[in-house]
């Protein structure tokens, strides 16, 4: 239903904001290298 979709959309927006606001330290989950402080993302983990 639309309520679930809105919630999901808001959640995704918040996640994107948190990722762009500050980088992830080594050991955190990542999808792209630029999400990590050292720009290293291997095996879905910051290196």
Swiss-Prot record:
Tissue spec: Expressed by the venom duct.
Keyword hit for Transport: no
UniProt modified residues of type Cysteine amide: 46
Primary subcellular site in the record, as a coarse category: secreted
Alphabetically ordered keywords of this record: Amidation, Disulfide bond, Ion channel impairing toxin, Knottin, Neurotoxin, Secreted, Toxin
Keyword Secreted: yes
Cell location: Secreted
GO cellular component, as recorded: extracellular region
Coiled coil: none
Domain of life of the organism encoding this protein: Eukaryota
Covalent S-S links between cysteines: 23-37, 30-41, 36-46
GO molecular function: ion channel regulator activity; toxin activity
Propeptide: 1-22
Family, similarity comment: Belongs to the conotoxin O1 superfamily.
Domain notes: The presence of a 'disulfide through disulfide knot' structurally defines this protein as a knottin. The cysteine framework is VI/VII (C-C-CC-C-C).
Protein name: Conotoxin Bu10
Organism: Conus bullatus
């Amino acid at each position: 239903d639309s309520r679930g979709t809105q919630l999901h959309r808001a959640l995704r927006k918040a996640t994107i904001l948190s990722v762009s606001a500050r980088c992830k330290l080594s050991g955190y989950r990542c999808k792209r290298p630029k999400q990590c402080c050292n720009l290293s993302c291997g095996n879905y983990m910051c290196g």
